[in-house]
Amino acid sequence: MADLSFIEDTVAFPEKEEDEEEEEEGVEWGYEEGVEWGLVFPDANGEYQSPINLNSREARYDPSLLDVRLSPNYVVCRDCEVTNDGHTIQVILKSKSVLSGGPLPQGHEFELYEVRFHWGRENQRGSEHTVNFKAFPMELHLIHWNSTLFGSIDEAVGKPHGIAIIALFVQIGKEHVGLKAVTEILQDIQYKGKSKTIPCFNPNTLLPDPLLRDYWVYEGSLTIPPCSEGVTWILFRYPLTISQLQIEEFRRLRTHVKGAELVEGCDGILGDNFRPTQPLSDRVIRAAFQ
């Protein structure tokens, strides 16, 4: 199987024509039409798509991942905007937090742009990735872009070494104190298009392991349209814990604007916002632990 780790001679992803970009912009999409995304977003038909199922027995231990320690230099964000976009909850980070080391190109910094959440209507499902075909109730994505090579996240999307995403599985248990700043205001942004500024958010509270050694790595894509490839995925082995009350706050959110007339058969509840797992193809999943 081919090792798709960062290499110097990676083939560049083809640039989109201007009319193709215009066609994709503003297109409505939903998770009920997930299998049809490729009709409008051609990248969704790519060979190296995300999410995937992680088979822990087939993951290849790669000690080189520990040669340069994975190093998140995150700072507390002041006045962060939390938004319900009808597909997920986004926490937009304004402070400059960066990620480097580990599987990322040496000397490159990846700036943390946002945190996104994916969850199920029930605790038996919700995560985008699965581990040995087991799903978690929720998955968090810390989305970074390569600020060494590019001037913005828009420039970085779809480019080799452009995007790095830390994925964190979430299980039900004790309350997560670091996420209280978000869960406490979700009732104020129940409907699509609503947003609220929170005074303080610390992304460091989302990192489960101080040593940051137990993670898997593979090359994939964005899990939402346009599903562009060129994404390095870093998935931590040990999940975060949130309380049942906290996840229920997410399950009260809506996919529509307030007062909108719902189509028949749609209850408007925001949940099950995960893409089905995609074929691994010839990709190798690397592990930083044995």
Swiss-Prot record:
Gene Ontology annotations of biological process type: positive regulation of calcium-mediated signaling
| Signal sequence range | none
For this chain, the annotated S-S bridges are none
Could you tell me the superkingdom of the organism this chain comes from?
A: Eukaryota
Tell me the keywords, alphabetical order: Disease variant, Intellectual disability, Metal-binding, Phosphoprotein, Zinc
Which InterPro entries does this UniProt record tie to the protein?
CA_dom, CA_dom_sf, Carbonic_anhydrase_a-class, Carbonic_anhydrase_a-class_CS, CARP_VIII
User: Which region ranges are annotated with the description Disordered?
Assistant: 1-26
Q: Which residues form the Alpha-carbonic anhydrase domain?
A: 27-289
Its function? Does not have a carbonic anhydrase catalytic activity.
Name of the protein in its database record? Carbonic anhydrase-related protein
Organism the protein comes from = Homo sapiens
The uppermost taxa in this organism's lineage are: Eukaryota, Metazoa, Chordata, Craniata, Vertebrata
Task: State which gene encodes it.
Answer: CA8
